[in-house]
Amino acid sequence: MSNPIDYSKGIYDAKKLGTPRLLILGAQHMFAMFGATVLVPLLTGLSVSTTLLCAGLGTLLFHIICKGKVPAFLGSSFAYLGGFAIVSNDGANPENLPYACAAVAFSGLLYVLVSGLISVFGIRRIMRFFPPVVTGPIIISIGLILAPSAITNCQSNWLLAFVALATVIVCNIWGKGMVKILPILIGVLVSYAVALVTGAVDFAAIGEASWIGFPIHKEAMGLFAIDGSEKFISALFTIMPIAIATMMEHVGDIAAISATVGHNYINDPGLNRTLMGDGLATAMAGLLGGPANTTYGENTGVLALTKIYDPLVIRIAAVFACILSFCPKFEAIINTIPSGIIGGISFVLYGMISAIGVRNVVENQVDFTNSRNLIIAAVILVCALGFNSVGGITFGIGGVSVTLSGLAIAALAGILLNAILPGNDYEFDSNPGTGEGTSLRV
């Protein structure tokens, strides 16, 4: 007679649970990431199927590079929404989206560069250039820049927006277990049910969609948008600086996973490997026409809830995501979600992005009685919001017209001021002690 499995101390080898349980656990992780992952293409105009494929393949690539040690799922990053909005002119110019994807690919390569620098110079020396006084205000700016688009979507149907918003709030505040981990998915489902009752859903496209199809579309790929044009160069300057914030998000998420599992992944397999894995996954996603990838805090919540820490379960979820991406009819169903629901979800989402930036500053005890820190934060916020309101700065380089967005200017100004102003006493802690990451998601 076999001994009963003790879940209290965590399961590090899930194979002992048997194949049926493994598949169920993998499906659970897929549902945890699902709401947030498909919301990004709905907000940006990218393909849901491509996004799911990139999330699945990106997660598997991440696990290969990290030697299969880190139980992390890579899904769509909300941090780049502001960049996509600027490049596509809030969706008015969807033909520019491939240029944004190409820039996302180069952002991923920036991760790889920083990974190499960490390997050569050490993590503490590199992280001094990206302290919370710089990354916090950048994250705050991302949410504030996106705020008008949330209101625009809400205006199409305030009832659906309110139901979606209220459901997310209730799940976050009073939810228990998986309900608390899946607020976006539940918010969409509840408000979608209301939309069905009120006749706000158009099913015409579902009948026309096939059951099986290839999720990659050549015309949407970032690979073929790398052409040296003005649109491509401007997209690079708009989107690549966002990687500064998302790299710090990555560090926070890896610290959260480390604290949850009880293993220091920042040291083993090392932050250089996790950054490289995330970066290459993001580069691949951009080239294929998907959004940037990032380690998902939702799945860390599932780890804490189930106490099953085997990365194999995450890889099963990644395979499920890949399989689902080959069903165009499923994408058609997702695309029937009314914009009012998207507005309600993004209403709280965009606000929480800014709030998480504030949390980043508070948790790291940034001293705003120090004039140095006040100046850096003030310049970042005004550059981001001010220049965004006037369309950024346009200048010529070698006959090519380049536009720097407000976010790009803010990031560059923050890094420069942090480097030249005296008093940079930030010391990066490579020993995570809490389960709180710097996740840019609800």
Segments from the language model and where they lie:
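Intrinsically disordered, low-complexity non-transmembrane regions of multi-pass membrane transporters
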Residues: 1-24, 203-223, 259-266, 274, ...
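Hydrophobic, membrane-embedded alpha-helices of multi-pass small-molecule transporters
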Residues: 20-33, 160-164, 182-183, 215-253, ...
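Interfacial segments of multi-pass membrane proteins
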Residues: 84-91, 172, 299-314, 320-325
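Short, non-helical or kinked segments that cap or interrupt transmembrane helices
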Residues: 46-51, 68-81, 126-135, 180-186, ...
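N-terminal signal-anchor module of multipass membrane proteins
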Residues: 1-72, 79-94
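Juxtamembrane interface elements at the cytosolic ends of transmembrane helices
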Residues: 5-7, 34-37, 164-171, 182, ...
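Membrane-embedded helical hairpins/re-entrant loop segments and their flanking transmembrane helices
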Residues: 10-20, 42-63, 240-311, 434-436
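Membrane-embedded alpha-helical modules
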Residues: 96-205, 318-430
